[in-house]
Every structure is written in structure tokens, then in C-alpha cells.
UniProtKB/Swiss-Prot annotation:
Record organism: Fowlpox virus (strain NVSL) (FPV)
Xref: PANTHER family: ANKYRIN REPEAT DOMAIN-CONTAINING PROTEIN 39-RELATED (PTHR24171)
ANK repeat extents: 63-93, 162-191, 195-224, 227-255, 256-284, 288-317, 321-348, 352-381, 386-413, 417-449
UniProt KW keywords: ANK repeat, Repeat
Annotated protein name in UniProt: Putative ankyrin repeat protein FPV246
Protein origin, superkingdom: Viruses
């Protein structure tokens, strides 16, 4: 009987079968439950086991190789009592390597993936995690994961909400029974494991209200700090407001500025509401100058961010380096959008000159980059460290490079080290470098003195020294030459649509009948730029035509009628997007 077979038996088999498995295991020659001999099997996995929450990942391998610890982990209350009655183990039998006592095992919740790995059932991970998520949304205990695993291993794959509630009630009953048994036989309540954690700390952070009350009622010392945190601070990480209230009733609470920040970073919105309602400062800050709003942006929870703002959190408050919550949120579009809608400045920079766009580009967040650009942020803003632009920061994300260039980013900027975005891209992402070449060539083609620009010169030298990049450059030049040869008016060729950003000007050219005969797909390198420019020009042309029609209708039989159509068109071109929107809305209003 190997160690893993025993572990599996305890999770799957009947009491009688598991007891037989334990007996067979203990009969192995040289077995000593208080040595590490058997753990050699476990070390081969070389895994890190997370026992309870995201804040605490044990940096060594833990496995309940003591049979008493195994039956406690599996919450086998009957087996715990039988094994203790046999006298081979005591309520204070300890795993010497981790100083894990039975109460530590009971008050921790093992990581699902590790349990399934030991059971050789990792293929059930998705099913079990989905069920755990359902249980979490139902506010059931974390320990239900153990009950779920045992049921799934028995072949049960469908669970109603009522089934999950029954499992939760049973696991809670088993835990209380085991705890009462251990305590009644003299288990040490305040013993610390290798990391300084007590059983009380574990029950509190895991939100196990019943076990917490039991330990406190039996004299567990609530004044012991773990990692410098009071039991109240630990309770705020449990997500269980009833737990927090119980701790406050018994032990009081402190107003450490880090508490609300820590909770906000987890997105525990119910705890946030409770803490703010009892007087915590929504604009408190930690040693880094971060407020709860800064921390909440990392939680991924829009609801948490919105709640803090509703309590009066300052949206553009700065931390010690001048970064605002928006700068921390640049990997999440929904949170970034909410902050801007609530008044956050998308163009703000910190003491290093980083803007939200720098951060969004570095994160590789296409959605946030698009969002920020829609608010007119400076696309070529340089930081104060080495003069890098958002394009420089995004070179390791090809999709970001492509987007920024399409939106007008300058590929010929130079930082303080003499690096251009192309040089950075060659070092970090070959695909990004290939995306940059067409824009370097286009800028060189568009600006008469482009060859005298320092950045252009550096980029052209880089291209000359790379055969593949040189081939891309040649293909770009061929396309541009062909566009130059396609006349769309007496003065302009097709290339004007990618060499100017003046959409109003292009809207005057796009009405030319020659466009219907142009095959945009024959320009694969610049197709996207061409198509976007043409579409934007067509859309604006439609808006201008509607505006002109509306003005003609409203000013009929006035001096306006005497103006030549050319003058009218020039006047309409002076209207900005706001004016055009007002006119469009007035039409819709009159139609309604």
C-alpha cells in the first residue's frame, strides 16, 4: 500500500476499507509516522501547495502523509475518532517539517488542483472548479470543495443547488465534530505552524464562522498577530461580514490604513461597504501612497471601483510617484472607462512622465488603448525617464504596435539612448518590427525632407542592415508608387488618403466616381490604412450632406439661398463634430 493509494482510499472508500488501507500502510517495514521517510514520494512532484488564500502560498511542499492528518483533511469525522481511539496518534501529532498540527490541517482548505493531482484525477479539475464557483456564489463554505471532490470521484456529476447546500451542511457538521473531538482531547489551540499561523487565523481567513466561534469559545487567543496582522485585519479578508462583526464584538478593531486597500485589491465589495459604513476613510493611503481606489483597479471589479467612487473616493488622487487609479487600471477597459466617465484625466502623467497610454500599451490592452485614443490623448507623449513613447512601451505586443501606428503614432521618434521604436522592436518582437516598416517608409515618402529626420535616418540604416526588412521596404515602395499613379483628381492621387490625416479634405475627394473602379485589395500592405481613411471620409461626407440639406431647408427663402453652392460647402466644412451631431439630433427630434 503506497502513500498515494492510501490518500485515494481515504477520499473514496468506506470507513472499513480506509481503515484497512491505513493498517496495510503502517505495516510497511520501517514505517515511522513521525519521520519524513515517506515524503520522498511527494517531493518528486516538486509542487507548491496553496493551502488557503491568495495571500499565503507555502513555499515548500506540504502533504498530509500522517494518516491522521489525511483523514482530517478529507473531513472523515468517524475515522478521526477511530484513529485517535487506537492511540497511535494524538491530537497534537505534528508534521515536523511544517509544524502542522491536526488543528492546522482541519482549519486549512487544500488547493483543488493539488488534491486531484495526488488522487490522479486532474481531468476532473474543470468540473470541480465550476461547482466550487457555483458554491461560492451561493455563499457556501470553502471547505465544500472537499465534499465536491469526494462526490465527483464517486461518479456524481450533476448537482442541484439543494445538493450543494446539503454537502455544505454536512462538511460543516463534520468539521465541527472533528474540532470538538480534537479540543476535548487536549489539542493545542494557539500552536503556530512554521509560518506563524494559528488555527484561529486559518478559520478566520477562510470565513469559517462556526469553527471560529468554537475556537474562541474554548479560549483561543485572539490577540496573536500573524504576519503583523491583527485578527480583525485577517477577518476582513474572509469575505464574511458576519465573521468580521463577530471579531469586532469580541476583539474590537483598528483603523490601519492598509486594511481598506487590501480588501479593495481583492474586490470584496460587501466587506468594503461594511468598513466604510463603520467609519473607514475611503481616501486613506498606504506606505506607497495608494488609496483603496488604486488598489481596487487591480481587482478587476467594476462594482468595487464604482462603490468606492460613490463613497467619495477622489478619482485622480495620486500615489507617491504621481500615478492615478486610471494608470493602474490600464489593463481593464471597463474600469478605465468608468474612471474616465467619473472624471479621471486620460492625459495625466506621473513624475516619470508615464501616461495612461504608456501603461495600456505596456499591458498590451488593445481595448484600453482604443478607449484612451477616443478621448484624444497624446499618442506620442514621451516619458521623463528615457523619452520613450507609448509605441516604444508596446513593442513587445505586435497588436498594440499595429493599432498605434494605424492611429498615427510616429515610428521615427528617438529616445535618450538613440533608440527608435523599430530598434526596440527588432530586439523584442520581430513581428512588431515588420509592422513598423510600412509606416517608416510611408513617412519618408510623405515628408519632403523626411530623409533628413534623425529618426528616419536611424530606421533606414536598420532596414538596410536586415535583408527581410529591406524586402518589406521594397514592397512598400512599390505599392506607394502604384498609388501615386492612380489619379483621383487633377491635383491628387490615391496616395493622398494615407499621406494626410485631414478627413474633411478627403471628404471632398471621396465623391469622385473613380473610386468605384479602384481595387483596394490590390494594395495588401496599405489596404487597412486606405480603407479606414476612405470609410471615414465617406461617413463624414454623409454627415456634411445631411447638414447642408438641413440648413437649406431651415433657411429657405432667406439670403442663404443666394450663396453659391461652393460657398455653402465651405461653410458646412467649418462645422465640427459637435455641430454636426446637434444638427443630426435636431432632425431625429423633428421626425419624432
Amino acid at each position: 500500500m503506497g502513500l498515494y493509494k492510501l490518500y485515494r482510499s481515504i477520499y473514496i472508500d468506506s470507513d472499513e476499507e480506509s481503515l484497512s488501507a491505513i493498517k496495510d500502510f503502517e505495516m510497511l517495514e520501517g514505517y515511522d509516522p513521525y519521520t519524513r521517510d515517506r515524503i520522498e514520494e511527494i517531493i518528486e512532484l516538486n509542487r507548491i501547495i496553496e493551502l488557503d488564500d491568495d495571500d499565503v502560498i507555502y513555499d515548500q511542499i506540504y502533504f498530509p502523509y500522517n494518516p491522521l492528518h489525511q483523514v482530517i483533511e478529507a473531513r472523515r469525522a468517524n475515522l478521526v475518532e477511530i484513529i485517535l481511539d487506537q492511540g497511535k496518534y494524538t491530537v497534537n501529532s505534528v508534521n515536523d517539517d511544517f509544524i502542522f498540527y491536526p488543528l492546522h490541517v482541519l482549519t486549512c482548505v487544500p488547493e483543488t488542483s493539488d488534491v486531484l493531482t495526488y488522487l490522479n484525477e486532474i481531468e476532473e479539475f474543470t468540473l470541480v472548479k465550476d461547482l466550487e464557483l457555483r458554491a461560492c456564489k451561493m455563499n457556501l463554505s470553502k471547505s465544500i470543495s472537499i465534499a465536491i471532490i469526494k462526490q465527483v470521484l464517486k461518479g456524481i456529476r450533476e448537482f442541484t443547488d439543494n445538493d450543494l447546500r446539503k454537502l455544505d451542511n454536512q462538511i460543516r457538521e463534520d468539521e465541527l465534530k472533528i474540532a470538538q473531538l480534537l479540543i476535548s482531547r487536549g489539542a493545542k489551540l494557539d500552536i503556530k505552524n512554521e509560518y506563524g499561523y494559528t488555527p484561529l487565523r486559518n478559520t478566520v481567513i477562510n470565513g469559517n464562522f462556526a469553527l471560529t466561534k468554537l475556537l474562541l469559545d474554548n479560549g483561543a487567543d485572539a490577540s496573536i498577530k500573524c504576519n503583523g496582522m491583527t485578527i480583525f485585519e485577517i477577518s476582513t479578508l474572509s469575505q464574511n461580514v458576519d465573521m468580521i462583526k463577530e471579531i469586532i464584538k469580541r476583539c474590537g478593531y483598528n483603523h490601519d490604513s492598509k486594511i481598506l486597500c487590501r480588501v479593495a485589491s481583492k474586490g470584496y465589495i460587501n466587506v468594503i461597504h461594511f468598513l466604510l459604513d463603520i467609519g473607514f476613510n475611503v481616501n486613506s493611503f498606504d506606505s506607497f501612497g495608494e488609496t483603496p481606489l488604486h488598489a481596487a483597479t487591480r481587482s478587476g471589479s467594476v462594482e468595487t471601483v464604482n462603490a468606492l467612487i460613490s463613497y467619495g473616493s477622489t478619482v485622480d488622487i495620486k500615489d507617491n510617484i504621481g500615478s492615478t487609479p486610471l494608470m493602474h487600471a490600464c489593463g481593464n477597459k471597463d474600469i478605465s472607462k468608468l474612471l474616465i466617465e467619473k472624471g479621471a484625466d486620460p492625459n495625466i502623467s506621473n513624475i516619470h512622465g508615464y501616461t495612461p497610454l504608456h501603461n495600456a500599451a505596456a499591458y498590451g490592452s488593445v481595448d484600453v488603448v482604443n478607449l484612451l485614443l477616443s478621448y484624444g490623448v497624446s499618442i506620442d507623449a514621451k516619458d521623463k525617464i528615457i523619452g520613450s513613447t507609448p509605441l516604444d512601451h508596446g513593442v513587445h505586443h505586435p497588436e498594440i504596435v499595429k493599432l498605434l501606428l494605424e492611429k498615427g503614432a510616429n515610428p521615427n521618434t528617438i529616445n535618450l539612448y538613440g533608440y527608435t521604436p523599430l530598434k526596440n522592436a527588432i530586439l523584442k518582437s520581430r513581428l512588431s518590427a515588420e509592422y513598423i516598416i510600412p509606416y517608416v517608409v510611408l513617412q519618408d515618402f510623405s515628408i519632403l525632407d523626411g530623409r533628413n529626420m534623425p529618426g528616419s535616418g536611424i530606421n533606414m540604416e536598420l532596414i538596410r542592415n536586415d535583408k527581410l526588412l529591406q524586402n518589406i521596404k521594397t514592397s512598400c515602395e512599390i505599392e506607394l508608387k502604384r498609388m501615386k499613379e492612380i489619379r483621383i483628381s487633377n491635383r491628387y492621387s490615391l496616395d493622398i488618403f494615407i499621406t494626410t490625416s485631414n478627413i474633411k479634405f478627403l471628404s471632398r475627394l471621396v465623391t469622385n466616381d473613380k473610386f468605384s473602379s479602384i481595387n483596394i485589395s490590390s494594395f495588401p500592405i496599405y489596404k487597412s490604412l486606405l480603407q479606414n481613411a476612405i470609410n471615414s471620409a465617406i461617413e463624414l461626407r454623409k454627415c456634411l450632406d445631411v447638414a447642408l440639406y438641413t440648413i437649406n431647408s431651415r433657411l429657405e427663402n432667406t439670403l442663404w439661398d443666394m450663396l453659391p453652392i461652393e460657398i455653402k460647402n465651405q461653410i458646412v466644412l467649418l462645422l465640427d463634430n459637435t455641430d454636426l451631431s446637434i444638427i443630426s439630433n435636431s432632425i431625429q427630434h423633428s421626425q419624432n
